[in-house]
């Protein structure tokens, strides 16, 4: 709507010797503002830090795992010839994620020597992770992977001649070392990874040989998933039909990369308390692929050749990655880390009495070669020996936990229920059903065959929502100790926090003897 206001301004001019008055009318038009009007956002519930409703005590506990060992084939799992689902030797590689699911005891069922510090009727106890150390055994080493049939056509780095046309099969046996990665990621929920997979095409008439559309997928990182080795985070088994473009340990696997952006933006901050990361890579060699290009090089990008250069070669170039030197000076492991402030709203609180520790360490990826003798002869023959490849890993997890308490007000319980309703169920809080007003039936002879069976079905156990995922289970429910000074990480924590351990031995009271006085002899 346009409002028009007419304003009459009487302007009088008196002309000398003339009885005339001039009146001028001025019209002004008012229009509303055409700028976009932004309304205030709808108020939403605010996510607060755990420090606002969790009170920390001065009680600390140490917990540590046993020596954790893994042995297997670094390239593939060995399955039973009679049963394809039965794994005889698992795949254990230095390029795999190790996702430890650390189980903690319920502090509300913990036997404390003094329980006067909290009220079990109005408060609940939780654990807070304040320190950890991830120990790594075994020497530093570089693991090598490859493919006996790698799709490598020609060397494009220092070629002194134009290559001939590829034949029907130009695959070669080639090995390489991978990108170097060290990673330590801590949270009370499993880490989230990302990878590129096959998407859905909008055009239903697309041919099967066309380049498939790509889609970024998110998934839980499980124990045994492959890391990014330098060839990208993607589903190689789906996107590479020839199974020859990458080494054999990833040609039928999915390489995942932690989705740091998504975990950092998580509202409650449960998946990522903090992380340590170190990556490095350089390119060692340059090759190109054999095969028919699905997307030819445009004609305006080159001038056609003649003779042996009449047919353009493959432009599908690829490098072989390398992680370079490994050294003890750049190690992230075998040293303590203290959590003072998490990057998210969860400041180290272990909801569900569990902790997820995700580890990647490619600096100890040595593959050991084992050999057995088939036939004993005086001269060396290759057929007289069998070669095997194994990879071993060694871990040690140590933690320092702080006991915390939560006062259960109506507001806090509502907030926790909105965050995760399973927490209140684990604390045995739930809705009490109203008493039934209907008449119940009760039989006299409950074992009689003349009536229906009176056995009540047993209650179903609570199903673990993470049961379908694979993690390395570490049970610390019976490995908590309040004597921090008896363990290496506990002593480091006491030293850096300024706390003192309780004395174990009572010192005896010092005894003092009165000085003896000599009597002087008096001469008579």
Swiss-Prot record:
Molecular function GO terms recorded: structural molecule activity
Cellular component aspect of the GO annotation: host cell nucleus; T=7 icosahedral viral capsid
Gene Ontology biological-process annotations: endocytosis involved in viral entry into host cell; virion attachment to host cell
Major site of localization recorded for this protein: virion
SUBUNIT field: Self-assembles into homopentamers. The capsid has an icosahedral symmetry and consists of 72 capsomers, with each capsomer being a pentamer of L1. Interacts with the minor capsid protein L2; this interaction is necessary for viral genome encapsidation. Interacts with protein E2; this interaction enhances E2-dependent replication and transcription activation.
Domain of life: Viruses
Family recorded in the similarity comment: Belongs to the papillomaviridae L1 protein family.
Region (Disordered): 501-524
InterPro entries, sorted: Capsid_L1_Papillomavir, Capsid_L1_sf_Papillomavir, dsDNA_vir_gr_I_capsid
Pfam families in the record: Late_protein_L1
Gene responsible for this protein: L1
Keyword terms of this UniProt record: Capsid protein, Disulfide bond, Host nucleus, Host-virus interaction, Late protein, T=7 icosahedral capsid protein, Viral attachment to host cell, Viral penetration into host cytoplasm, Virion, Virus endocytosis by host, Virus entry into host cell
Function of the protein: Forms an icosahedral capsid with a T=7 symmetry and a 50 nm diameter. The capsid is composed of 72 pentamers linked to each other by disulfide bonds and associated with L2 proteins. Binds to heparan sulfate proteoglycans on cell surface of basal layer keratinocytes to provide initial virion attachment. This binding mediates a conformational change in the virus capsid that facilitates efficient infection. The virion enters the host cell via endocytosis. During virus trafficking, L1 protein dissociates from the viral DNA and the genomic DNA is released to the host nucleus.
Protein name per the record: Major capsid protein L1
Species: Human papillomavirus 58
Location of this chain's protein in the cell: Virion; Host nucleus
Lineage per the UniProt record: Viruses, Monodnaviria, Shotokuvirae, Cossaviricota, Papovaviricetes
